[in-house]
Swiss-Prot record:
PROSITE patterns in the cross-refs: RF_PROK_I (PS00745)
Pfam family, one: PCRF
InterPro entries assigned: PCRF, Pep_chain_release_fac_I, Pep_chain_release_fac_I_sf, PrfB
Expression across tissues: Expressed in leaves, stems and flowers.
Any one biological process term the GO annotation gives: translational termination
Induction (UniProt): By light.
Localization in the cell: Plastid, Chloroplast stroma
NCBIfam families linked to this entry: prfB (TIGR00020)
Gene giving rise to this polypeptide: PRFB1
Phenotype of the disrupted gene, per the record: High chlorophyll fluorescence phenotype (hcf) and severe lesions in thylakoid membrane complexes, predominantly in photosystem II.
Keyword Mitochondrion attached: no
The protein's name in its UniProt record: Peptide chain release factor PrfB1, chloroplastic
Residues of the transit peptide: 1-58
Native source organism of the sequence: Arabidopsis thaliana (Mouse-ear cress)
Length: 456
């Protein structure tokens, strides 16, 4: 038997002539980690007759391949080196462009001015203003630190490239180190560039995510639970602190609603675009016939603001406050005392519910803070100067907008209807891989804002 094998992976694109059934198949140089494959092994794109039952190991001990191990290793490493050198050049250009646009001299001057203000004897006379100044100072220092780190990382990678060019042989460990640096640098640069698109007054804050099961019965409640996990996984991957502070369980499965707090810098700015209706199409696990089911869940996102940052006042006559027993499992307060609080802003219909505190008063205080935060964001979005100017009909229409489809059957696809961004890797999305969608939405939002500015 004779055939042609195209190798994937480190030696991508190479073709080797194979005669007979080799005991060992060389796919990788010997100085790299070994990987033993389980057998029998069916090679992709081969006929059923091309089935190997012989041991196949990533090594180079016995082989019928007509190739020199030493030459292959050297050639493979040089290809990696050329790729690395190109990646370093691209990263270096990105860093240079970002640092140039940041205007480092002006940045340093702004830091100096704010530090001077912070040392003034009257600095703390206005605590709110003082906190804003310190927050701005920390932001500028973080920005300066990142710009410095970018320069250091790209210089380290450039040094390795120069050393490799001067050496007689290629050091695998040095190449791997440089590749790791560039990979981490590119991730940091992507995130840094993304933050430049965040300019809203609350974008730097943490986020509160409200998830509510919509039409679809038990399937919708299960879908709401899946969304809750998706956002928790996203927060964990961003190294944010996530906490479910309120949850109402479904009757058979899933949840009716949940409130998730995500603490971390820019959490609200990143995830605010998730607000809207999320639609799922799948074979229902709760239907004995496995029929295809379409369900919906609503997502609201508000900034996680400290009490002192919520400075608006709402007339008592505009609030409808009701008390209910807290739901949940166990606990002396559960279903015995009416500690759960629901507050509705009558003019707009905006409502919040709080159950996590042990007392009615504490829940009322926290619910009022969340309600004010919601109204502040809505006012900012509608460009209203006062809360009383908010249009309730516009609020309902915006929150009811469908933003994304998740199709599990008859094919797999996640598609954002606003940006057109899509992927067939639905498993990764449900595991919190939302960054591509977030990036696409922020760019889309920025483009619309620029177009609106030009028109006006």
């Amino acid at each position: 038997m004779s055939m042609e094998l195209t190798v994937l992976g480190p030696l991508a694109g190479r073709s080797f002539a194979i005669a007979g059934k080799p005991k060992l198949l060389l796919l990788r140089p010997t100085n790299l980690p070994l990987l033993r494959l389980s057998l029998p092994l069916s090679l992709p794109n081969f006929s059923s007759s091309s089935r190997f039952n012989s041991p196949i190991v990533f090594a180079a001990q016995e082989s019928n391949l007509s190739v020199s191990n030493e030459n292959e290793t050297s050639e493979w490493l040089m290809q990696d080196f050329y790729t690395l050198r190109k990646d370093v050049e691209i990263a270096s250009a990105r860093v240079e462009e970002i640092r140039a646009s940041a205007n480092l001299q002006q940045l340093e001057q702004e830091i100096t001015n704010l530090e001077s203000k912070a040392t003034d004897t009257s600095f703390w006379d206005d605590r709110t203003k003082a906190q804003e100044t310190l927050s701005s100072l920390n932001d500028l220092k973080d920005r300066m630190r990142l710009l410095s780190e970018f320069k250091t990382m790209v210089e380290d990678a450039e040094t390795i490239v120069k050393l490799t060019e001067e050496m007689d042989s290629t050091d695998v460990s040095l190449l791997e180190e440089a590749m790791g640096i560039i990979k981490e640098l590119n991730k940091s640069l992507d995130k840094f560039e993304l933050t430049q698109l965040l300019s809203g007054p609350y974008d730097k804050e943490g986020a509160v995510v409200y998830i509510t099961a919509g039409a679809g019965g038990t399937d919708a409640q299960d879908w709401a639970d899946m969304l809750l996990r998706m956002y928790m996984r996203w927060g964990e991957k961003q190294r944010y602190k996530t906490k479910v502070v309120e949850m109402s369980n479904g009757e058979e499965a899933g949840i009716k609603s949940a409130t998730l707090e995500i603490e971390g810098r820019y959490a609200y700015g990143y995830i605010s675009g998730e607000k809207g209706t999320h639609r799922i199409v799948r074979q229902s696990p709760f239907n004995s016939k496995g029929l295809r089911q379409t369900s919906f869940s609503g997502v609201e996102v508000m900034p996680l603001l400290p009490e002192e940052a919520v400075g608006i006042e709402i007339p008592e006559e505009d609030l409808d406050i009701s008390f209910t027993r807290a739901g949940g499992k166990g606990g002396q307060n559960v279903n015995k005392v009416e500690t759960a609080v629901r507050i509705t802003h009558i003019p707009t219909g905006v409502a919040v519910r709080c159950t996590e505190e042990r007392s009615q008063l504490a829940n009322k205080t926290r619910a009022l803070i969340r309600l004010k935060a919601k109204l502040m964001v809505i006012a900012e979005e509608q460009r209203a100067t006062e809360i009383k100017e908010i249009r309730g009909d516009a609020v309902k229409a915006e929150w009811g907008q469908q933003i994304r489809n998740y199709v599990f059957h008859p094919y797999k696809l996640v598609k954002d209807v606003r940006t057109g961004h899509e992927t067939s890797d639905i498993t990764s999305v449900m595991d919190g891989d939302l960054d591509p969608f977030i990036k696409a939405y922020l760019k889309h939002k920025y483009t619309l804002a620029m177009a609106s500015a030009v028109t006006n």
